[in-house]
């Protein structure tokens, strides 16, 4: 196994290798215009507290705009002079659409999302927007602490008044940030630790990612779905633990509700169909969009294609395999996972230079799994006899490569995959289906 970097990097570039935001810990940017988008529905007291706290931010006031995005409250929210209000009709829980509406009205280079019931400390905005100002791909998530603010005056300094009334912080979230080094060690499943109540990113990257999915019309999940797409588009995830905002009341998981499990199940089922990565999607059902697409070279004969495709689907049962042999060979074309046409947007594409037989799936599965992390973008696959078999590349690396002419910020890894061998033009099909014979039967 060997590894090589792609491109040369210095700390004045607008990207970092992998997810290495820590390489910019020493840099403070020149302030840029920031738009704070406060999502609101029928919480006038909480909104007033949050807007008061935003007026006390230590970020340059002339570069800070505040937009309240109202999700159809019964009464029009009252906002102070200088705060812009945008509203949409009440058609259920549509926080995703409300946030997008706020973005449409925004003029800032950096977007900072808050919920109306989540009140920031005075240095919150400055700390949240540091990385997105330096790195257009940065997505930062602050620390959402919880307190009972019901008896706290609206104009009380939140940093002094909230700690005495603090409620339990979600342990799963706190522990995840600790394990990952504040998301420095992020991967394909780290979207679960990005919450829209305390979120910031550049306007440019938000637009490139497509914004929030407005089809979400019930509580929860729209921020995770966006964060998944953002990561796949090349986001650099960072938790900023000293950017603190206080949520009025307990975490959702800590509330007493007989419907909480049902709501959680609805969210998980919805996301399972939208996020086709291991640990998030169904374990056996075919995903709506494949996580892995394997592409065979053109002109592979039916026998070789059969052995190759069948062995690949043993290793990756939910992958899509692309081969022009599917047009002619009924035994291949009748499987919905096999196609003659390549897809246009999958998480990982494995391009084979030669047809292969996978006699031991585990080494190949481990090699492809490396692409779930942040640092490696391409894996070159070599057989035990030194034959170059092909290469796998992540969508994340491809998106960054297109974005930056100087490179994609990922490493390339060369892996010898034991148990995977090149297939000759007429492999012994009976040996394959019967499960007998070694690699020489298929060469």
Model regions and ranges:
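N-proximal low-complexity "stem/linker" segments adjacent to membrane-targeting elements
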Residues: 1-56, 265-300, 431-439, 443
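Short, acidic, metal-binding catalytic loop of nucleotide-sugar glycosyltransferases
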Residues: 52-63, 310-319
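A conserved acidic beta->alpha catalytic loop
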Residues: 67-78, 118, 324-329, 353-355
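Glycine-rich, basic loop-to-helix element that forms the pyrophosphate-binding segment
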Residues: 88-106, 333-342
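Short aromatic/hydrophobic "clamp" motif used to bind/position activated sugar donors
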Residues: 111, 349-351, 355
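Conserved donor NDP-sugar-binding/catalytic core segment of glycosyltransferases
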Residues: 123-169, 361-394
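A recurrent flexible, glycine/aromatic-enriched loop bordering the glycosyltransferase active site
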Residues: 168-170, 181-200, 378, 396-413
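Acidic donor-binding loop at a coil-to-helix junction in glycosyltransferase catalytic cores
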Residues: 218-225
């Amino acid at each position: 196994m060997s590894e090589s970097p792609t491109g040369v990097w210095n700390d004045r570039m607008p990207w970092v290798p992998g997810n290495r935001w820590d390489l910019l810990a020493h840099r403070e940017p020149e302030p840029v215009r920031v738009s704070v988008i406060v999502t609101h529905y029928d919480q006038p007291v909480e909104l007033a507290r949050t807007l008061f706290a935003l007026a006390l931010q230590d970020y340059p006031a002339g570069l800070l705009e505040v937009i309240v995005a109202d999700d159809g409250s019964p009464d029009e929210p009252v906002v102070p002079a200088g705060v812009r209000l945008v509203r949409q009709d009440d058609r259920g829980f549509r926080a995703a659409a409300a946030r997008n509406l706020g973005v449409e009205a925004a003029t800032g280079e950096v977007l900072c999302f808050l919920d109306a019931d989540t009140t920031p400390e005075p240095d919150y905005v400055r700390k949240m927007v540091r990385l997105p100002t330096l790195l257009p791909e940065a997505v930062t998530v602050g620390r959402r602490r919880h307190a009972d603010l019901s008896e706290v005056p609206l104009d009380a300094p939140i940093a002094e008044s909230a700690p005495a009334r603090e409620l339990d912080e979600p342990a799963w979230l706190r522990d995840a940030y600790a394990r990952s080094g504040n998301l420095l060690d992020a991967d394909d499943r780290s979207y679960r630790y990005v919450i829209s109540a305390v979120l910031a990113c550049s306007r440019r990257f938000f637009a490139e990612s497509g914004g929030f999915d407005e089809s979400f019309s019930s509580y929860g999940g729209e921020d995770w779905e966006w964060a998944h797409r953002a990561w796949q588009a090349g986001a650099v995830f960072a938790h900023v633990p000293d950017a603190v905002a206080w949520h009025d009341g307990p975490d959702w998981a800590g509330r007493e509700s007989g419907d909480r499990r049902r709501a959680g199940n609805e969210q998980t089922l919805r996301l399972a169909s939208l996020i086709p990565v291991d640990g998030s999607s169904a374990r056996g059902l075919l995903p709506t969009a494949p996580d892995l697409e394997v592409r065979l070279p053109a002109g592979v004969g039916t026998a070789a294609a059969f052995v190759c495709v069948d062995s690949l689907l043993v290793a990756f049962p939910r992958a899509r395999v692309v081969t022009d042999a599917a047009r002619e060979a009924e035994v291949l074309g009748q499987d919905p996972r096999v196609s003659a046409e390549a897809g246009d947007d999958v998480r990982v594409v494995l391009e084979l230079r030669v047809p292969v037989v996978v006699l031991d799936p585990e080494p190949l599965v481990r090699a492809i799994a490396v692409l779930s992390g942040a640092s490696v973008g391409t894996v070159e696959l070599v057989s035990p006899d030194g034959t170059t078999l092909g290469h796998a590349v992540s969508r994340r690396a491809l998106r960054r490569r297109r974005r930056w002419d100087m490179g994609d910020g990922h490493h390339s890894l060369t892996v010898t995959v034991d148990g995977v061998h090149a297939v000759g033009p007429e492999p012994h099909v009976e040996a394959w289906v019967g499960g007998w014979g070694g690699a020489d039967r298929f060469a």
